[in-house]
Amino acid sequence: MNKSSRVLDVIVIGGGQAGLALGWHLQQHGLDFLILDEQTRPGGNWRNYYDSLQLFSPAEYSALPGMVFPGDPKSYPLRHDVVQYLEAYAAEFQLPFEGDTRVVEVVQNDKAFEVRAANGSTFTARAVVVASGAFSRPYTPDIPGLESFSGTRLHSSGYRTPEAFAGQRVVVVGAANSAVQIAYELASVAQVLLATREKIRFFPQRILGLDFHAWLKFTRLEHTRWLSDQSTPVLDTGKYRKALDTGRLQRKAMFQQVLPEGVVWPDGTTHQVDALIFATGFRPNLEFLAQLPVGDQQGRVLQRNGVADQVPGLYFVGLPRQRNFASATLRGVGADAGYLMPRLLRHMDRVGSTETPAQRSRNPATGLQGKRASHRRQPS
């Protein structure tokens, strides 16, 4: 086991949009921190999405704190644009990042946390922020007969390009943005059906010349409980609804059973299928927190606005609807990270320094008094 003798202020688990946004705030306050991620480079799960994935918010509303998204502010960036932006962001602010480090366990010892990785490394910090987000564990619903299916079955996280399905009969499962976007592009090369449990809810991408996200920001509607409780609509310039209206895309109520060569619809009819693609979302992967009381029997994270209910010093950034509708988005993680900072700093004051006298003598700038002086000097 490679255990570092260095005691950090904060360990950030996750090097995607949430972890980098938090890193910027930690840096502004002069804290000693390290971002850990299982991937080699910053960018998080954006590296794993399908090639044509396009943001549903324009670049001007898709930036992390301290650095605008490059290019036309009215454009809608693609997946590779986001990856490049996140890499550039980490480099611009020289955020301390350690890749190829998959966290497998977090335990709390007295005033500090011990974070253990699969590669044998162990880190110690006074606080831990879980920023691995909500998109780390693909979710596929349990459907009778699914395991018997002989065709291609994959989650949208494994989908890349439509060419691989040319000439095939494909059913895409899901009613949100990714499902509709994937089905729409597949329809150019394949026979496609959308299977949904409820009707697809469309919302115009632009209203009176302004993007949907501009209205959310200006009206502050995204901060209301009402919007956070709503299912996510499909943002549409008109092409998706038109594709359904003209028959280019077809929607059917969710199938009830899977057969080796197809599916069974609610009316009992069968449909032969070559491929099933599940755009059914993700779940947070919090297995490394199994030693801490952070979840209930329903799988919900025990936190309020990013602060763990029962574990002092443990925080979250990037969970869906953590504080509002935007919490799991590029534009939302920065504000949520900023919200945590005064709470995290108060925790630092309560626990004091975890360094030994010998460590403080070697590096006096990392002592508590030095840190708090740094907090006062840096902007928030």
Predicted feature descriptions by range:
Residues 2-15, 21-39, 43-45, 74-363, ...:
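Flavin (primarily FAD) cofactor-binding/catalytic cores of flavoenzymes
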Residues 50:
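Glycine-rich loop at the start of a catalytic domain that most often binds anionic cofactors/ligands
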